[in-house]
Amino acid sequence: MLISKIKFSYIFFICYFLLGLLIYSDYGIGIEEHFQRQNGFYWLKKILTFLRFDDLNFLALEKYNAIRSYDPSLPDSEFFNFYGIAFDTPAAFLELIFKFNESKLYFEVRHLLNFFYFFISAIFFYLILKRRFKYKIIIYFGSIFYITNPRIFGDSFHNNKDVFFLSILTICIFFLFKYFEKKKLKNIVLFCFFAAIATSSRIMGLYLPILLLIFIFIDYLSKKILIKDFLKQISLILFFFILSLYLHYPYIWKLNFFEFISWFKAFFYHMNLRILFFGDYYHIKYLPRLYLPTWISITIPIYILMLLIIGYILIFKRIFQRTANIRPHVQTYNDLWRSTNEKKDLFIFVSLTSFMIFAIFLNTAMLSGWRHFYFLHNFIIYIAVYTLNLIILYFKKKKN
């Protein structure tokens, strides 16, 4: 009787969490994990020096030097000092505090921590779907899609960069959508906080506040908000985002505003590597335009791919029709979205489209499949669930 009263969602996520606890130690060490561990202690000793925790700083310095002496071929953290603060530094702190001295143990702890972040993001993705769609069955299907995509599921136990960014981005979008629903200060602060963490993890996280500002500007153009509300929202978002970024991201402490463009150059550094793709070798900066679409299409289940294509076409059709019907000086039905749900759909559509165009046409350096664009997984599954929702609505309408 008691079990029947427990929400199925609790059982679902408890089972998933227990599964993660059972298998997280089965995964090996990723090619970049040694450097990421080094990077964590690099930032940790900087922070401890600033806070004047001399005893802990001495231990962190010992760890850092031990890593450098064990593998001198690792890249220099002084050069690659523009990411790693959000995941690697807390992981290094845990290793230091709990005195994890065995290599097997501290890498397994990192894997468990990585799984924990993804697990939390899965809960937030479930909540995103729950606030958007009303049919429970497709909400659970969407959550299963999000968790069980083979490539994402496997990497969620060891990929401390790309899956971590996906996780933070998902949490950030949850608060962004809450802001779409209610323009509360709390939603702005939480969105900006997680957007800042996403940005310090991958520079592509910067798109989140930028796209939100564009949506607010569209609201203003369509006369949904007054000029004073427009300026207030813009100011609050910029203030809390920059503040959150500055408080936790030492890389920008040395930022010279007049050299802002050069500050971005480090993020576009790429190694001089060639990869095999369809029988030919290509430089990672000059890949065929089909590289990303091919890797996405062959590594996600075919049913998700089909749902994505159908949903993408339908959303595009709706946006095209709305845009074509916009008339000056006409207020009724003269906008790109007519509800908060449509606004959410448009945000996801624009996000996926923008990054696909960016990756395909602007010679983005990629390797190891599409791992640098794992964050698209959020948008892909959302649109797939959107299609499932339309299918259910169609059959319900037909039945009636």
Description of each model-found segment:
Residues E108, L112-F133, I171, F175, ...:
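Transmembrane-helix motifs of polytopic, lipid-linked glycan transferases
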Residues M1-G20, I120-I123, K130-R131, K136, ...:
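Start-transfer (signal-anchor) and selected internal transmembrane alpha helices
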Residues L22, G142, F175, N187-R202, ...:
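Membrane-interface alpha helices of multi-pass inner-membrane proteins
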Residues F133, C172-I188, A198, S222:
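Membrane-interface transmembrane helices that cradle and orient dolichyl/undecaprenyl
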Residues K7-I14, I120, F125-T148, E181, ...:
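Transmembrane-helix signature of polytopic, membrane-embedded enzymes
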Residues I31, R110-I120, Y140-T148, I152-I171, ...:
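Multi-pass, polyprenyl lipid-linked donor-dependent membrane glycosyltransferases
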Residues D162-L166, A198-S201, Y207, I298-I302, ...:
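Hydrophobic/aromatic-rich transmembrane helices and adjacent perimembrane loops
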Residues K46-F50, Y64, F79-T89, F98-E102, ...:
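Transmembrane-lumen/periplasm boundary regions of multi-pass, lipid-linked membrane glycan transferases
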